[in-house]
Curated annotation (Swiss-Prot):
Naturally occurring in which organism (per UniProt): Oryza sativa subsp. japonica
Record protein name field: Poly [ADP-ribose] polymerase 1
PANTHER family for this protein: DNA LIGASE, POLY [ADP-RIBOSE] POLYMERASE 1
SUPFAM superfamilies xrefs: ADP-ribosylation, BRCT domain, Domain of poly(ADP-ribose) polymerase, Glucocorticoid receptor-like (DNA-binding domain), WGR domain-like
Known catalytic reactions: NAD(+) + (ADP-D-ribosyl)n-acceptor = nicotinamide + (ADP-D-ribosyl)n+1-acceptor + H(+); L-aspartyl-[protein] + NAD(+) = 4-O-(ADP-D-ribosyl)-L-aspartyl-[protein] + nicotinamide; L-glutamyl-[protein] + NAD(+) = 5-O-(ADP-D-ribosyl)-L-glutamyl-[protein] + nicotinamide
UniProt lineage: Eukaryota, Viridiplantae, Streptophyta, Embryophyta, Tracheophyta
BRCT domain segment(s): 381-473
One of the GO BP terms on file: response to oxidative stress
Region described as Disordered: 177-199, 218-237
Top-tier EC class: transferase
MF terms in GO: DNA binding; NAD binding; NAD+ poly-ADP-ribosyltransferase activity; NAD+-protein-aspartate ADP-ribosyltransferase activity; NAD+-protein-glutamate ADP-ribosyltransferase activity; nucleotidyltransferase activity; zinc ion binding
Name of the gene this protein is made from: PARP1
Residue span of region Zinc ribbon: 291-335
Keywords carried by this UniProt record: ADP-ribosylation, DNA-binding, Glycosyltransferase, Metal-binding, NAD, Nucleotidyltransferase, Nucleus, Repeat, Transferase, Zinc, Zinc-finger
Entry similarity comment: Belongs to the ARTD/PARP family.
Binding site for Zn(2+) 3: 296, 299, 312, 322
Length: 977
């Protein structure tokens, strides 16, 4: 991952066009300026608010630390000193070491539940550990902490006085080990040279390396001693001399060498020739003084100097930038080349005076604070263990309960907030939800998830932050200001409402071409999450055309802009194609014809959006039309086709709603999302055969790909299986939303009655009388089989509908007649999935989907205890009514297992899989339905099998034809807390 952006940027003005935000006067070209970095409103990114350096440095408390200033080490030395003097501390001084020491805690570990945030290993009970308030309440091994911050004064740490004498001595031994004196060889590093003032002989101090270089033990780590003022002064003198030499060379090059000659010289030495003159000067000066840089070992792209390190400028794939960085770049040992054809007296004279052996570049040392933060960030990036980022607020019945969790969270390295704040990760309830509770109200207002108490226990047990979705008491309302985009479909597409032409125009169609596209780009390494909408709109009653553009950041209406240009049809098409090529790097025909389209690095990717084509004449006053459906069925149709239900589901999954028409992501786009998740699953499982740096870059690239294909408000690196499974469930829900959208439409002009929509399901749905035998059997089955551990809610049966989906019985009849062991079993699912289920039947996860999260492989899962399946309805207090299925399942001979086992299908001779639970329905209370179908409606009792890892039975079939949906139940959940 790229380092987070800094608060300030320092540079010499590239032109005289900028104005100072403080004094309002122009900033002259090449004048030192300081820019405060702010979120841009017209594009997805940060922009500097420029000021004269003198205007900023004349005010108090503007810049807090030199580490907050990007580009400070590339300024002329005198200008660097101005900023350092303003801040009041030079890098790596005793004062900064004292500052970091004041922010640390040291103690003996009270348990073995915490993990070191640097190495990821468990911190054993009874061993000394250190916490830095700079990084929250996470813990480190004392040795790991002192390796990252050798300048820290442990005697100033909070808790030092209460350590035992033996522990103090052990820690002080580590301090001595990690801080070698000047002129001595460190136990983990190389020997520092003394009394070498010539820049050509100075040795570059090594600092914390990128994770891409491996661990410190791979090559050794030279530690810059901060205990010696002489050493620090010597280093500063070398840095000053180096800076003066670099700037003298750049000034001479700018005076005597043209831009074309700079490019030719860089090309002759195998260096990057792109960019403006200032970048060419930087690269030439670096290469001429220290030798030509080698290429990135990960992706073979060019390296460039920035912020005390050399970074890769390339892309590890078409989806992601390369994250490689190093302080020890490979350089050519040959002399810097001057092309033979170049006739430049200055360069010829310089070449003759060039020394054969180049010195190493002296790199500025990190301040202890920056060293700690960066090392922690790098080493933690793919160690998902640890709870240091979790900030929890708790509402409990008693102070003792809250205090108990508070201590457990502290021991685990998590953070406890006494009250809900905007920085809180979640609010956890240790009691029944009280809507009038002040903290609950605040959480709702701040859109912070409200979770069950069990979430904390699971996080502590697994020692990582788990996804919130499975533990939500109620879904946080996370709609963006604009809500869902209004869609009016005309022809085969829809005009964007922001154009103002929805009522008077339509998307231009020219043969098979539909001039409308939505582009997306998510790049986690750059913090980019952008969309770009491009349309050609033709007037309904004329031939005039408009090119409409809208761009911004996904989920943030305050960032971005629009543009509407009127032009002729021919010019509008040309402009559309030009912009598409500019934004994607591909011609329009490649996407339109689905041939040879290649995602280009740093470019947008088109989303495959299916608006569908409405057929049939419009009808007015749909709501006033009489329905022929029974009242119970009419109410069910209202539930199934309520657009707000689908909108809430997409918001829960943090799908972008302001620019994504509801349900319009195509089936192909969702399949590509599954493919990206499968790639991530394979990378997460491949821990032995790949370098960590390469694996990290590939996971970032696959995450970029996923969030580009599936626009999300909060993209992030998908780096553990829990998060991966949440994304799989999200895509499964999107599949059903896509089916519902295609079947009945969600656009604002949809004019179908509920009777019409019911017919489109192609599934006969008949309400059962409450006094019939089948209804009573289903009710008994529901009331009897509530599992003892599912205490959060009870279930009330409201309606039962018999089902007969077109064609399902004919497929099932073969198995019904040939397989024994048929049972009536439960299946639960989200309300938004049922249009897809009723119209297409229960479906097995597609081949593109990862296998993560399926205990017994990809199949259809059923239960014999109602509450086991009811968990998957995902209802809440606000919407307490869900739907459940009772299906007749032909199980045949079952492959019985006591623990999760990955498989594609059961062994030969077996027709299904049964996971054996420790609690089962009482067999003596089973009933028979329609002669040969078993209804396991007995009360839950302990099973004879005690060693199983499963709490309750699970039944899995791997062929959809073994299932016949029989009943749809409308069930009300009564939440107890």
């Amino acid at each position: 991952m790229a380092a987070p952006p800094k608060a300030w940027k320092a540079e010499y003005a590239k032109s005289g066009r900028s104005s100072c935000k403080s004094c309002r006067s122009p900033i002259g070209k090449d004048q030192l300026r300081l820019g405060k970095m702010v979120q841009a409103t017209q594009f997805d990114g940060l922009m500097p608010m420029w000021n004269h350096a003198s205007c900023i440095l004349s005010k108090k408390n503007q810049i807090k630390s030199v580490d907050d200033v990007e580009g400070i080490d590339t300024l002329r030395w005198d200008d660097q000193e101005k900023i350092r003097n303003y801040v009041g501390s030079a890098p790596a001084t005793a004062s900064s070491a004292a500052a970091i020491s004041d922010k640390c805690t040291i103690e003996v570990a009270k348990s073995a539940r915490t993990s070191c945030r640097r190495c990821g290993e468990k911190i054993k009970k009874g061993t000394v550990r250190v916490s830095s308030k700079l990084e929250g309440q996470g813990w480190y091994h004392a040795s790991c902490f002192l390796e990252m911050s050798p300048a820290a004064t442990v005697e100033n740490f909070s808790g030092w006085e209460i350590l035992s004498h033996e522990d103090k001595r052990a820690v002080l031994d580590l301090v001595k080990k990690d801080a070698p004196s000047s002129g001595q060889t460190s136990s983990k590093g190389s020997k520092r040279k003394n009394n070498q003032n010539d820049i050509h002989d100075c040795k570059a101090p090594k600092i914390i390396r990128s994770i891409s270089e491996g661990t410190a033990e791979d090559k050794g780590k030279a530690v810059v001693s901060h205990d010696s003022n002489a050493n620090s002064s010597d280093l500063q003198e070398k840095l000053k001399e180096q800076s003066d030499t670099l700037w003298k060379l750049k000034d001479e090059l700018k005076k005597h060498v043209s831009t074309a000659e700079l490019r030719n010289m860089l090309e002759a030495n195998g260096q990057d020739t792109s960019g403006p003159e200032r970048h060419l000067l930087d690269r030439c000066a670096d290469g001429m003084l220290f030798g030509a840089l080698g290429t990135c070992p990960v992706c073979s792209s060019f390296l460039y100097y920035h912020g005390g390190q050399y970074h890769c400028s390339g892309y590890v794939s078409e989806w992601s930038k390369c994250t490689y960085s190093t302080t020890e770049p490979v350089r050519s040992k040959k002399k810097w080349k001057i092309p033979d054809e170049m006739d430049n007296g200055y360069l010829t004279k310089w070449f003759k005076s060039q020394k054969a052996k180049k010195p190493e570049r002296v790199l500025p040392p990190m301040s202890p604070e920056k060293s700690l933060c960066q090392s922690t960030q790098q080493n933690r990036s793919f160690l998902s263990e640890g709870l240091d980022k979790l900030r929890v607020s708790i509402v409990g019945q008693s102070k003792d309960v809250v205090d108990g969790w508070k201590q457990k969270l502290k021991d685990a390295g998590a953070n406890f907030n006494a009250t809900v704040t905007k920085d809180s990760s979640c609010l956890v309830l240790c009691s029944e939800l009280e809507s009038e509770n002040a903290e609950v109200k605040k959480a709702r207002r701040l859109k912070i998830p409200i979770l069950r108490e069990g979430y904390l226990g699971e996080c502590i047990r697994k020692n990582r932050v788990l996804p919130f979705d499975l533990y939500k008491v109620e879904a946080a309302l996370e709609s963006s200001k604009g809500g869902t985009m209004t869609v009016k479909v005309k022809g085969r597409s829809a005009v964007h409402e922001s154009s103002g032409l929805q009522d008077t125009g339509h998307i231009l169609e020219d043969g098979k071409s539909i001039y409308n596209t939505t582009l997306n780009m998510s790049d986690l390494t750059r913090g980019v999450n952008s969309y770009y909408i491009l349309q050609v709109i033709e007037e309904d009653n004329g031939s005039d055309c408009y090119v409409f553009r809208k761009w911004g950041r996904v989920g943030n209406e305050k960032i971005g802009g629009t543009k509407l240009e009127e032009m002729s049809k021919i010019h509008a098409i040309q402009e559309f194609r030009r912009l598409f090529l500019e934004k994607t790097g591909n011609p329009w025909e490649a996407w339109e014809q689905k041939t040879n389209f290649q995602k280009q690095p740093g470019k947008f990717y088109p989303l495959d959006i299916d608006y569908g084509v409405r057929q049939g004449p419009k009808r007015k006053d749909i709501d006033k039309m009489k329905s022929s459906l029974p009242p119970q069925l009419l109410e069910l149709m209202n539930m199934l086709f309520n657009i707000e239900t689908y909108r809430a589901a997409m918001l829960e999954f943090k799908i972008n709603m302001s620019e994504m028409p509801l349900g319009k992501l195509s089936k192909e786009n969702i399949q590509k999302g599954f493919e990206a998740l499968t790639e991530i699953q394979n990378l997460l499982g491949n821990t032995n055969n790949q370098e960590l740096a390469v694996r990290e870059s590939l996971i970032v690239a696959a995450s970029n790909r996923f969030f580009t294909l599936i626009p999300s408000i909060h993209p992030h690196i998908i780096q553990d299986e829990d998060d991966l499974m949440v994304k799989v469930k999200m895509l499964e829900a999107l599949q059903d939303i896509e089916i519902a959208s295609k079947l009945v439409g969600f656009d604002s002009d949809n004019d179908e009655s509920l009777d019409d929509k019911y017919k489109k399901l192609r599934c006969a749905i008949t309400p059962l009388p409450h006094d019939c035998e089948d209804y009573k059997l289903v009710e008994k089955y529901l009331l009897n089989t509530h599992a003892p551990t599912h205490k959060e809610w009870s279930l009330e049966l409201e309606e039962v509908f018999s089902l007969d989906r077109d064609g399902e019985f004919s497929k099932y009849s073969r198995y019904k007649n040939n397989l024994h062991n048929k049972m009536l079993l439960w299946h639960g699912s989200r309300l938004t999935n049922y249009v897809g289920i009723l119209s297409q039947g229960l479906r097995i996860a597609p081949p593109e989907a990862p296998v993560t999260g399926y205990m017994f492989g990809k199949g259809l899962y059923f239960a014999d205890l109602v509450s086991k399946s009811a968990q998957y309805c995902y209802v809440d207090r606000k919407n307490p009514v869900g739907l459940m299925l009772l299906s007749e399942v032909a199980l045949g001979d079952m492959y019985e297992l006591k623990k999760a086992t990955s498989m594609d299908k059961p062994p030969r001779g077996k027709h299904s899989t049964k996971g054996l639970g420790k609690t089962v329905p009482l067999e003596s209370e089973f009933a028979k339905w329609r002669d040969d179908v078993v209804v396991p409606c007995g009360k839950p009792v302990p099973a004879s099998i005690k060693t199983s890892e499963l709490m309750y039975n699970e039944y899995i079939v791997y062929n959809t034809s073994q299932v016949k949906m029989q009943y749809l139940l409308k069930v009300r959940f009564h939440h107890k807390r």
